[in-house]
């Protein structure tokens, strides 16, 4: 099933469950906090296990790709030269940072604004996201890096595939970027 569709289904189910729970009861609020914190902890452990496997594997295969430019800032496409290990670590570190960002937002909404419902709604999402992350699929579940799991990963489009949203890996695009002087320096 498509991850976006399953996210919507899970959110609808969680909304129905949250209507049946007394969000004013301090005992239930404590259980919701424990559920959310354990969910965050489990997802953090999953990402750390994947990170450990990436470092242990130490795949120094060089990869080149053309990163799409940012239309908002007017930047053009840029050639990126990196290793599989560095790319994977960058992806995992980005996922870990997203956990911290989500915790900050939930902390603000729950502790400062006194909302408990979003805390309950987000109690499943971090673990689901961690288990669906491409790096986790490759390094923890042992799936081959082909098809959708081929590096560099394409970002999922909000509008279901209208326009290209991922980096270009074809030889022509890489050669054009090298000739245009948009080459990046290999990070070591």
From Swiss-Prot:
Cellular component annotations (GO), alphabetically ordered: endoplasmic reticulum; endoplasmic reticulum membrane; membrane; mitochondrion
Modified residues (Phosphoserine): 157
Entry keyword set: Endoplasmic reticulum, Membrane, Mitochondrion, Phosphate transport, Phosphoprotein, Protein transport, Transmembrane, Transmembrane helix, Transport
Keyword field contains Protein transport: yes
InterPro entries linked to this entry: SND3_fun
Subcellular location: Endoplasmic reticulum membrane; Mitochondrion
Residues covered by region (Disordered): 157-188
Membrane topology field: Single-pass membrane protein
Keyword Protein transport tagged: yes
Biological processes annotated in GO: phosphate ion transport; protein maturation; protein targeting to ER; protein transport
Segments of skewed composition (Basic and acidic residues): 168-179
Parts of the chain that traverse the membrane: 27-47
Other comments on record: Present with 61800 molecules/cell in log phase SD medium.
Function comment: Functions in the SND pathway, a SRP (signal recognition particle) and GET (guided entry of tail-anchored proteins) independent pathway for targeting a broad range of substrate proteins to the endoplasmic reticulum. SND functions in parallel to GET in targeting proteins with downstream hydrophobic motifs. Involved in inorganic phosphate uptake. Also involved in telomere length regulation and maintenance.
Subunit structure: Interacts with ENV10/SND2. ENV10/SND2 and PHO88/SND3 form a complex with the translocon in the endoplasmic reticulum membrane.
Family: Belongs to the PHO88 family.
Identification of the protein by name: SRP-independent targeting protein 3
Organism field: Saccharomyces cerevisiae (strain ATCC 204508 / S288c)
Gene: PHO88
